[in-house]
From Swiss-Prot:
Low complexity composition bias: residue spans: 22-36, 43-89
Region Disordered: start-end pairs: 19-93, 289-359
Protein name (database record): Vacuolar membrane protein KLLA0F03465g
Superkingdom, taxonomy of origin: Eukaryota
Biased composition (Polar residues): 319-328
Family: Belongs to the PRM5 family.
Annotated disulfide bonds: none
Amino acid sequence: MDLEYYEASAVVLEERALPALTTSTEETTAKQTSTNTDDDKTTSTSTSTSTGTSSKNTKLPSLTTKTTDGSTLTTSTGTSSTETASYTTPVMELPSAKGNPNIWSSNKPTGTVFIAVGSAAGFIFLALLVWFIINTWMSYSQAKQLKKFNNMEKQFQNPFIDDIDFSSGGGYYKADEDISTYKDTPVPTKNGGNNSFTPYKRASHSMIRLLGGSTDDGFGGGTPSSIGNTNLGSMNPLERVDAIDAANTGVRKSLYISPTMEVMNQQRRSTLFNNLNQSAVSIDTPEMMEPTRTVSPERRTYKHEKSKSSLSKLVDSTIDLTASTTLDNQKRQGRSKGHNKSSSITPSVYLDNMLEDNS
C-alpha cells in the first residue's frame, strides 16, 4: 500500500460582520493508503484530518476546496468550532455648550417671556379698573349735584312756595343737615324782642318778592287797599318803605324785574329819606338811575317827561300818601323845634317847676 501525502491549500468563505475584522487559519493533513491484493481488485483508503480555528461563530457551514497534483479531487465539508468573544460598548456623551460658538445658549431666567406678558396684561387691567372707579365716582357726584339743582329749580318755579315747610328740610337748602339745630331758635332784634323765624324765612324782601312769596312781617301779600288799614304814621320811614314795597310787589309770580318800577321805587325812597341822616341809613336797593353821560340832556328831559306822564296814573295814590306823611312829620318836627326855642327852660327852672307842681 502506497502512502502518499498531499499538501493542499484551502480557502474558507464565511460571513463577516462590520466593523470588526475577523481572520481565520486552517491546517489540513490528508493521508491516502492504497493496497493492491489482486490484479483485478484495487482497494484504496484515504484518511483526512482537518483542524481549524476561528475567531467568530458562523451561522452557515464553511466550504473547503482542496486541490491535489494528481487527478483525484476530493471535496469535504468542514465544521466550525465555537469560541467565546467579549465586546466593549462605548458611552454616548453630549458635548458641552460652554465656549462652543456653534451652540446657542441664553443667560435669561426661565419663564422671562411669560413674566413680561403677564406684567403687561396686569398693568392694563389695573389701569382700566382705576379708570372705571374714578369715572363712576365723578358720575355719581355730578348726578347728585344735578339732582340738587333740579330740586332748587322746582322750588323757584313753584307758585305755592308759601305753603312749603322750610323747617322740615324740604326748602332750598335741603342738603343742610343741621337745619334742625336752628329750626325754632329765636333771634334777638334791635328793639329787644325775639324773632322766631327760621333763617330760611328771614330772607330779604327782594328775594321773597322774586320767589313769589311774602316777607312774613305783617305786610306780605298785602294790596294797596290794605295799606290804609295800617297806621303808617306810627312807623319809621324804613318800615313804611318796606310796607309799600310789599303792598305793590307782593303779587309778583315771575323772575322779571321792571327797570321802570325800580326807578320809581328809588325816587320814592329818596323822597322819604330826605330828612334822615344818610350816613346812618343804608339802602340795599342798587342805584338804578340812568348814567348822566349815556344820552344828551334834551333826550333825557324828553324821556323823563314821557315816563313821568305815562306812569303818573300808577303812582298817584302812593306819592300822595308818602307826600302827606312826609309833610306831617315835617310839621311835627317844626312845631317841636319852635316850642323848644321859645321856652328855652334851664335845668334849674325846670326843677323848680316840678317841685311847685308836686307841692
